[in-house]
Structure formats: structure tokens, C-alpha cells
A protein has these predicted regions:
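Small/polar/charged residue-enriched interaction surfaces, especially the RNA/DNA-contacting tracks
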Residues: 1-118
């Protein structure tokens, strides 16, 4: 991976994390809970937990997060999020990289939420 690709990925993570907070998709407490589920139980569990929450617009959230995750694996238009998350679990390297990307995005979002006073 070239330095330019890494820099653009970092810039994208920063932008998406800000948008998650500024567009009201997640508040700081929701971000902290998602980070906890992601860290302790993994990517698929985070997706299932977000879907189970009535106070989280999971479709808006995962459309934003997909902008980062597509660097590892694209999601086709007809593919459901459930199938996408199950398919990435078949490749451990991709799964761990996506987990790192999601953690970084949510950590940045948490800092944005703190700075905006959410």
C-alpha cells in the first residue's frame, strides 16, 4: 500500500468520524457502547448490536462505515449488510483490518463528540 493510499484512508476516516457525529447518527454514549462491543466481541457482534438498538439508525451508520470498509472489501448493491459481515469473517486478515478501521473511526468519532459537547 502506497503512502498516498494510507494518507487518503486516514483523511477518509477523519471525515467519516466527524460526519457520524455532526449528522447526529451517533452520540458519545452510543459510540462508547459500539466500541465496547467491537473490542470485546468483534465486527459481526457490533453490527448485530447496532441493529438491535432502536435509538441507532443502523442503516445510516453502516452506510457511513462502508465508505471505510470498502477499502478492504466492496459491498455490492444487492448484497445485504448481514451477508457482507458474514463474508468478511471468512478471511481473518481482512476481518482484523476492518476491525482496526472501525475502531479508529469510532475512536475519532468519540473525540469529535467530546469536542462538540455531545
Amino acid at each position: 500500500m502506497s503512502n498516498q493510499k494510507v494518507e487518503s484512508l486516514e483523511a477518509l476516516i477523519s471525515k467519516i468520524s466527524y460526519e457520524i457525529v455532526s449528522e447526529g447518527i451517533l452520540e458519545e454514549t452510543e459510540i462508547n457502547k459500539l466500541l465496547g462491543v467491537l473490542a470485546n466481541n468483534g465486527v459481526y457482534a457490533m453490527w448485530v448490536w447496532a441493529r438491535s438498538r432502536k435509538d441507532i439508525n443502523d442503516h445510516a451508520l453502516f452506510n457511513e462505515l462502508m465508505r471505510v470498509m470498502k477499502f478492504v472489501k466492496e459491498k455490492s448493491e444487492e448484497e445485504s449488510f448481514e451477508n457482507y459481515f458474514q463474508s468478511i469473517s471468512e478471511d481473518l486478515h481482512k476481518l482484523l483490518f476492518i476491525k482496526q478501521l472501525l475502531e479508529k473511526t469510532l475512536i475519532y468519532a468519540r473525540y469529535h463528540a467530546k469536542s462538540l459537547g455531545d
